Structure formats: structure tokens, C-alpha cells
Swiss-Prot record:
Pfam families: CBM_14. Its main location: secreted. This is Periculin-1. It comes from Hydra vulgaris. Induction: By a wide variety of microbial and tissue components such as bacterial flagellin and lipopolysaccharides (LPS), dsRNA (reflecting an antiviral response), cell death signals, monosodium urate (MSU) (the end product of the urine catabolism, which is one of the principal endogenous immunological 'danger signal' in vertebrates). Coiled coil: none annotated. One of its GO terms (molecular function) is chitin binding. Residues 32-80 are annotated as: Disordered. Antibacterial peptide. May also be active against virus, since it is induced by dsRNA. It comes from the Eukaryota. It is found in: Secreted. One of its GO terms (cellular component) is extracellular region.
Length: 158
């Protein structure tokens, strides 16, 4: 019985050792691959030959760069471009809106029943309450104020 246990354990150890030796050989091949297999893999028959300008360590002339990227087609914007329409109180106020330098929209200096404001760079309609009119000359950052019929427009405050 004791001999069977020793025999079985020696067979297991022998199989494990054989497997260990094979994996060690594979590991060694992965770390140090044979040089003959990879010798010509990255070498090409057509070697790159730089131009004479590069051989002499000269920079190519500016005209070479310009000619390389130059196109005979010049950009021509469409002649029929129209800005996005701005509708306020169901009225197209695109012509009356000014896109101010601060990114806000406002109706021109004429009093209106509503005005255009800009929230997150999107034009929205801000109607004045009943009985009030819009004055574009006043307000913070070009948004204007709603004023009563007899109120005077003050100078714009920034």
C-alpha cells in the first residue's frame, strides 16, 4: 500500500515537472524570441530616400509647403444665407432683433409690447406685462426694461 502511494505521487510529480519545463521553455521564447524569425519582418526592400534638401539639412522652402496644401477651389459661401428667424408673440422680429456684443438679443430702440432676451445664448420672448412697453435703451447687458406709457427711457446701464 505504501509503495502504491509513493508510485502515484512520483508519477504526479513527474507530470508536473514535465509541464513546468514546457511552460518555462515557452516563457523563455516569449522573452527572448529567436532572431531569425523576426529579422526581415520590419525591413522593407524599398527604403525611404529623403530629397536632396533634407540630405543637406536644409529646410524646404515656404513655397513648397504652400503648394503642397493649396487648393484651386476657393471657399465661396452660399449667397442665399439667411439668419435664423426669431419669433416673439407670434410675430417675426428677426429684423428688429439685435445680437448685441455681450451675446444678448434685444429689440431695437422702439418701444414694443415684448422683447427678446438671451438665456444660455438662445433667444426667448419676454412679454411685458399688460399696459407696459419695452425700452431697449435701459436695462442690464442690453436686456431692456418694461416701462409704463409715460415713463422716460433712461440711459443704458452696464
Amino acid at each position: 500500500m505504501f509503495m502504491k502511494i509513493i508510485f502515484i505521487s512520483s508519477v504526479i510529480i513527474l507530470a508536473a515537472a514535465d509541464e513546468f519545463i514546457e511552460s518555462e521553455d515557452q516563457y523563455d521564447l516569449n522573452i527572448n524570441p529567436p532572431k531569425e524569425e523576426y529579422k526581415n519582418q520590419y525591413e522593407s526592400n524599398n527604403e525611404y530616400q529623403p530629397t536632396s534638401e533634407y540630405n543637406n539639412n536644409k529646410k524646404p522652402s515656404k513655397t513648397d509647403y504652400e503648394n503642397q496644401y493649396e487648393s484651386s477651389n476657393k471657399y465661396q459661401p452660399k449667397s442665399g444665407y439667411k439668419p435664423k428667424k426669431v419669433i416673439c408673440l407670434d410675430i417675426d422680429v428677426t429684423k428688429q432683433c439685435k445680437n448685441r456684443a455681450d451675446g444678448n438679443y434685444a429689440i431695437d430702440n422702439k418701444p414694443r409690447a415684448g422683447y427678446i432676451a438671451c438665456v444660455n445664448k438662445s433667444p426667448i420672448c419676454m412679454p411685458c406685462p399688460y399696459g407696459l412697453t419695452f425700452c431697449a435703451k435701459t436695462g442690464y447687458k442690453g436686456l431692456g426694461h418694461c416701462l409704463g406709457e409715460y415713463d422716460e427711457c433712461q440711459s443704458r446701464s452696464y
